[in-house]
């Protein structure tokens, strides 16, 4: 796991009895940043004696930095390792002129905290499972949601997600392009 994983990652890993091996980038100059490269991941996978079940990264990081997801996904898949992404601050990445969303760049599993960068109430999120991921992922995801999720989901949050889905399908990409253009002009 990248060293900048969200603090809830550790209790979840402990509950699931997972051994976590921390990954540090060669260029470790940032305080909140942990911009791992494909080379960092490859080096780790070459020198480890026990192949991990997955590489877990936070992307984008808390400062908005993005890793080269496609290259990292290639390294993971060449080594038979799954790539799991905490995309908490990047739900909008799918709607850039060229998608930078982890699922489009090779991630096997990805969670978007829609409430952070999309018009959704707090707690609203999307869990994406790649169609090429192992078949057990869907069943395991349902079990995990039963363990970690609520038995009484907020209908307001579900409605906000549904409304957001409609907005994403209809006009969000155009509005994002327009806003990005305006911000670029201000620079």
Which role does the model predict for each range below?
Residues 1-187:
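Conserved PLP-enzyme active-site core in the AAT-like
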């Amino acid at each position: 796991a990248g060293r900048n994983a969200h603090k809830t990652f550790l209790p979840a890993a402990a509950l699931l009895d997972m051994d976590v091996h921390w990954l540090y980038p060669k260029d470790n100059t940032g305080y909140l940043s942990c911009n791992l490269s494909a080379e960092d991941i490859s080096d780790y996978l070459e020198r480890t004696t026990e192949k991990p079940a997955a590489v877990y990264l936070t992307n984008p990081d808390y400062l908005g930095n993005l890793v080269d997801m496609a290259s990292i996904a290639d390294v993971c898949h060449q080594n038979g390792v799954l790539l799991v992404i905490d995309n908490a601050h990047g739900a909008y990445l799918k709607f850039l002129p060229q998608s930078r969303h982890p699922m489009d760049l090779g991630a096997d599993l990805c969670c978007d905290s829609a409430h952070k960068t999309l018009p959704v109430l707090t707690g609203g999120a999307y869990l994406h499972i790649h169609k090429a991921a192992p078949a057990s992922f869907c069943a395991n995801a349902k079990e995990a949601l039963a363990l970690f999720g609520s038995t009484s989901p907020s209908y307001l949050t579900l409605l906000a997600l549904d409304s957001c889905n409609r907005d994403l399908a209809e006009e969000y990409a155009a509005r994002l392009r327009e806003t990005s253009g305006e911000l670029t002009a201000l620079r």
